[in-house]
Design a protein with these regions (language model features):
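Catalytic cores of glycan-processing enzymes that make or break glycosidic bonds
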Residues: 1-222
Length: 222
């Protein structure tokens, strides 16, 4: 494990915290043989318990926090393993909803994960509210007309769902306030009222930027 330990120490030497992108990679990685299709791939498994113990040890030695980006296809039990070692996960406001566009109430957010409005791979909160991500996908031909219409109908329900979740705290958000600026401000305060031990507000959402930094699945067109 020397290379892994040296990598951790090199990073901790210059920062008080470390964010591990796709932390699921400590447990398994989907690999595809050269020239093959994704259907020919398989999971390559790693000694996750040993890696997490080393990660916890080095973070303690350097008095640093560790964040694990646990979004996407998360192996069963991994989040429990992370929380047992005080490694924070990540919860994204736009993702914290069920299929009925019911957003997670403020007091139901976990205390084992960082809370944030969005990420560089997702629309900004302002862009999400104005459907800019849908605009881009339609403009680039990544979705057909039927999918676009369904997406926009669903987004309208999501906006109503977020609006309702924010309005449950009358001191935070007034029911009649529907402008994007009010939603941005209320969303930031909402996350601050959760149990999350750390809240991250991306600069794009702090400034109300409309366009997202990266549109996954595109190269040179966004």
């Amino acid at each position: 494990f020397r290379a892994f330990i040296e990598m951790l120490r090199a990073n901790f030497a210059h920062a008080g915290g470390l964010r591990i992108d796709h932390v699921m990679g400590l447990q398994r990685l989907w690999v595809i043989p050269l020239g093959a299709t994704p259907a020919d791939g398989a999971y390559l498994y790693y000694p996750v318990e040993d890696l997490l113990r080393l990660l916890a040890l080095e973070s303690l030695r350097h008095r640093a926090i560790v964040l694990g980006e646990d979004l996407g296809t998360v192996p069963e039990g991994l989040r429990d393993k992370l929380s047992e070692r005080a490694i924070l996960g990540m919860r994204i406001l736009l993702f914290e909803q069920d299929y009925g566009a019911r957003f997670r109430p403020v007091l139901e957010w976990p205390d084992t994960a960082l809370a944030t409005t969005s990420t560089h791979d997702l629309p900004t909160l302002n862009g999400w509210w104005h459907e800019r991500d849908i605009d881009w996908n339609a403009q680039l031909g990544l979705v057909d007309a039927d999918t676009e219409d369904h997406w926009r109908d669903n987004r309208a329900h999501e906006r109503n769902g977020l609006h309702h979740a924010l309005s449950l705290d009358p001191q935070n958000f007034q029911e009649e306030a529907t402008g994007a600026d009010q939603v941005l401000n209320a969303s930031a305060r909402f996350l601050g009222h959760t149990h999350a031990p750390l809240v991250l507000l991306p600069v794009e959402d702090a400034l109300g930027v409309l366009e997202q930094a990266n549109l996954p699945g595109t190269v040179g067109t966004h």
